[in-house]
């Protein structure tokens, strides 16, 4: 079973959210990076761009496929992980740490409440793979 930290919130699109005040740090789950295989390129938005919840904000290209990235919450991008320019494989090595994607100043912090808990996400991925 993939690593699913308890302190994060999860989307059914396999993104995670870590809340830091009014900021959401967003990345893809261990399950997602495992399904993708070796990541070779990550396309992220620019700081200052705004997104609605569940809107595509970029893509991840792996040796297997290209997958869109979706923001589970709405808001303005305040940071992007510049490390992906030279090291896209950080997504595979540390999806919940150095492999974070973007930081968003949340418009509606309550949106996080509609996301899955770690246990719910584990159940979702099990059901999805059956």
Specify the residue positions occupied by each region the protein language model found.
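Acidic, low-complexity mobile loops and tails
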Residues: 1-56, 93-130
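Conserved hydrophobic positions within beta-strands
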Residues: 14, 60, 69, 74-78
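Residue-level recognition of beta-strand microenvironments
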Residues: 17-19, 63, 80-83, 109
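A short beta-strand motif that forms part of the nucleic acid-binding face
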Residues: 30, 64, 73
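Gly/Ser/Thr-rich helix-start
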Residues: 38, 59, 66, 76, ...
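Short, Lys/Arg- and Gly-enriched loop/turn segments at beta-strand edges
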Residues: 59-70, 87-89
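Aromatic- and Lys/Arg-enriched surface recognition patch
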Residues: 78-102
């Amino acid at each position: 079973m993939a690593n699913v930290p308890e302190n994060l919130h999860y989307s059914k699109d396999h993104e995670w959210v870590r809340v830091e005040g009014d900021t959401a740090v967003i990345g893809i789950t261990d399950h997602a990076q495992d399904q993708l295989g070796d990541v070779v390129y990550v396309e992220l938005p620019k700081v200052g761009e705004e997104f609605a919840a569940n809107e595509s904000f970029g893509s991840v290209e792996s040796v297997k496929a290209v997958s869109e990235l979706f923001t589970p919450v709405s808001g303005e991008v305040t940071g992007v992980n510049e490390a992906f320019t030279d090291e896209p494989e950080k997504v595979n090595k540390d999806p919940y740490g150095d492999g974070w994607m973007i930081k968003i100043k949340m418009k509606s912090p309550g949106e996080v409440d509609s996301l899955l808990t770690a246990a719910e996400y584990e159940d979702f991925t099990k059901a999805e793979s059956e």
